[in-house]
Amino acid sequence: MNEERTKELLEQTPGIDVLVELINIDPNSLNASGRVDYLAALERQGGWLQALMQIAIVAVAGSEPAADRGNYSDVDDPQREEIASALNLAPVTAQSRIDVARVLTQHLPATCTALANGEISSAQATVIAKESSALLRRGIDPDQLRYLEATAIAYSEFHTPAQVTHKVRSIVAKMDPVEFEVEVAQAAQTRRVTFTPQPYGMAQIMALLPASEAQSVWLAIDKLARSNRDKN
């Protein structure tokens, strides 16, 4: 009986009534599939709570930055510190949460709705907000923004946040190819390789490279490793 009810709750729109009923179900009393449904239902409730959290963050921080430096990554010292204290976050993390909440609540209503309905996760909503911010700063056409948002939400259903990031970036690149090329050139200037000694005769090499160059390096290392393995 509980398994059937859990499955019904999974399909219902998230909200306080559904959450209360889930709390009153002991997941250990469910069979294997029922436990999975229970977990998924709780995850959907998490999306609903996160949607409320975006509204609450903006209520504390305000809908606009203290200093108008754009739609993203502005610094709001008093509000940021209040949110950092309330949520036990580092100040830089609190500022990021403020930025994301403003973008979601003011520019991405469909994303907020999808989050509240448990259709996407908080991580996916954050990705959509962050990747949309550059276009918002440049004054994206509302129709383009709606297309970007709808595509990202639909893609999120069966993909991870990292995959959603790549998808949204590809859409952004097509919408503003000139700016994308500028950003690619700027990113290439940050390439670097570091060598760090480690204990017990070991060392660590870290590299930030253009993808094509990184692929070449990886293939060379892999080839050398395979050769040494075959010799042994």
Language-model regions, residue ranges each:
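Conserved C-terminal region and hinge/linker of Rieske [2Fe-2S] proteins, especially
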Residues: 1-232
